[in-house]
C-alpha cells in the first residue's frame, strides 16, 4: 500500500499532506540551524564521507558503502564505517562490532558491512559518538557513514547520494505522503549522485548491482543461482521486487516469493513456515546475516556487488583520496 501511495497510484497521499508539510518544516529548520551556525556540527579528526539518500529505503546504499570501503582498502587506505544500526538493539551505545556481534544487537546492514569488508564498524544514533568510539578502537584514515545524509550534527567532507534509477522520487512529497526525506533539489548540493539501475541522468554515475553465485548458508558451497530447484525466494529489504527481478534475470523463477519488512527480525520457526517439503530457500545477503545462526542445509543467499560506470567511478575515488593524502 505504501508503495502505491508514494508512487502516486493512490490518492491517499492527499490525506497525509499535513503531516508531510510538518515533516518538511521541521527537517528544513534543523538543516537551516546548522547552516546559520545556531547549532554546531562535530568535526571528526579524519575525513568523513556520507553515503545516503533522499528517499526512504531500498536504494542500494549499503552495496555502495561496501564498494567504497573495498576500493579504499585496495589502495592501502584504512576505512572505518559508522551507522545508525536500524533494526538492532544493543545493551549500550556506541557499539563497536566484533566477530560475535549479532544483527539483533547492531542491525543487519552494519553486520553485513563488517563481514564483507573486515573494516571496523560502529553503530549509534549519535554518529559523532560512533566515530569517537571507532577512533578509540582502531586507526581509520577515513570514515564512511552508512546513511546519515540528514544527520547534520556530524560534519562531512563529501556527500554521496544513491538514487533508485527506476523509482526515482515517487510523487515527490516528504514523508509520510511521499518517500522524500529532503527535496530533490538537494542533489545540486552534494558531491556525487549514484543512480542504481534505470537510466542515469546528466552528471549522475550509473550503477548496477551484479549478482554473484548463490552461497549455501551452512556449507559455504557456491553454485549458479539458476541451478537451484524448487526455490522459495525471500527478501527483507527496502524494495523486495528488485531482488525477485534479479533472480528472473539470472534464469530462476521461484515457486513462491516472500516480501518482508526492511530490517525485520527473523526466527527459525517463522522462516521454516515459508517452506514446504523439498523446497529450498533463497534470500538476500542482508537476510542471510540474520539467519546464519539457525540456517538449514537447503538455505542459500545471493550476494550482489555494486559496479559503477567508468571513468566517473575512478574520478570519484580520486576526489575522495585527496582527502586522505
Swiss-Prot record:
Q: Does the keyword Lipid metabolism apply?
A: yes
Give an example GO cellular component term for this record: plasma membrane
* Catalytic activity field: a lipid A disaccharide + ATP = a lipid IVA + ADP + H(+)
Q: What pathway is this protein said to act in by its record?
A: Glycolipid biosynthesis; lipid IV(A) biosynthesis; lipid IV(A) from (3R)-3-hydroxytetradecanoyl-[acyl-carrier-protein] and UDP-N-acetyl-alpha-D-glucosamine: step 6/6
- Spell out the InterPro entries in the cross-references: LpxK, P-loop_NTPase
Keywords from the UniProt entry: ATP-binding, Kinase, Lipid A biosynthesis, Lipid biosynthesis, Lipid metabolism, Nucleotide-binding, Transferase
Q: Provide a GO biological process annotation.
A: lipopolysaccharide core region biosynthetic process
MF annotations from Gene Ontology? ATP binding; tetraacyldisaccharide 4'-kinase activity
Q: Which SUPFAM superfamilies does UniProt cross-reference here?
A: P-loop containing nucleoside triphosphate hydrolases (SSF52540)
Source organism's superkingdom?
A: Bacteria
The family annotation for this protein states: Belongs to the LpxK family.
The record's function comment reads: Transfers the gamma-phosphate of ATP to the 4'-position of a tetraacyldisaccharide 1-phosphate intermediate (termed DS-1-P) to form tetraacyldisaccharide 1,4'-bis-phosphate (lipid IVA).
For this entry, the protein name equals Tetraacyldisaccharide 4'-kinase
> Taxonomy-wise, where does this protein's organism fall, top ranks first?
Bacteria, Pseudomonadati, Pseudomonadota, Gammaproteobacteria, Enterobacterales
Q: Which gene encodes it?
A: lpxK
